[in-house]
Amino acid sequence: MSSFSIPSRPRSPPSDISWRCLGHTDELQKDPNDINLITNWPGTGREESKCPTELSYGDDGKIHWSFDVPPDASSVSWFKLLLLREEDTNDDRDVSEYLVSAREFLSRTNKTAIDAVSDFLGALWKNTIAKIVCARGQMVVDALVFRVVITVPAIWKGYARQAMHKAADQAGILKERAAGPTELVFANEPEAAAMSTLIERGRRPGTGGVYVVCDAGGGTVDMISYKIDQVDPICMKEAVEGKG
């Protein structure tokens, strides 16, 4: 069982690297209702709240990611699942054509799962920082101490989180900055969903209320129930152990 609270200033900036799509926010505001969602991505002329978690490498080794992946390129998705050991994946996912294809792609390109996640996170991070600098200015960004939150499946074991941490470090997210060290935090995906839902305008959760959160993604499904212990700030704990 686990418990968590929603702080008065939400964690920032959060990144949900999922199997098929990814969303990212620049959260410099104290008001949780005033969150800046990154919607501009390389390779597309329209605004999108999420981008496909897809990666390819050019003949020269250049990284193409998300909407920037050429339509005729050999690409990989679902690569985050490969951070898990085979004994910790179920049979259905093991025979998934996407997962088999991902393993073959990494073998062919001489990449590890950590390398693939790192390359994608690195491209995402550069794009995000560039957008924030454009909106806020370089001096403002240079003065900020970053706190980065990456959401992961609730049932992930410690070694998988360590692999994700290594990928984030390898991506340059944790590199030394004059403003101070960057803090990297992992949040369970259902917890992030619950936090997002409960801070929506007009919602008034009461003490003792129970919420069931179903996170049905492209590669995993988590279902967890939370009971509200207090409302100011909102503190919750698992009502029953989560399954996924």
Regions found by a protein language model. Give the residues of each.
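Conserved nucleotide-binding/hydrolysis micro-motifs of P-loop NTPases
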Residues: 155-157, 191-192, 218-221, 230, ...
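Phosphate-binding loop and its immediate beta->loop->alpha context
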Residues: 31-169
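Gly/Thr-rich phosphate-binding beta-strand-loop-beta motif of the actin/hexokinase/Hsp70
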Residues: 1-35, 198-238
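Residues that form ligand- and interface-recognition hot spots within folded domains
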Residues: 16-19, 24, 59, 83, ...
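Hydrophobic, small-residue-rich alpha-helical packing segments that form membrane-like cores
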Residues: 164-212, 216-217, 235-236
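Extended hydrophobic secondary-structure segments that form protein cores and membrane-embedded regions
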Residues: 11-13, 145-153, 183-188, 211-215, ...
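Glycine-rich phosphate-binding loop plus the immediately following alpha-helix
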Residues: 50-59, 74, 228-244
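Beta-strand elements of modular eukaryotic interaction domains
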Residues: 3, 28-29, 41-46, 54-55, ...
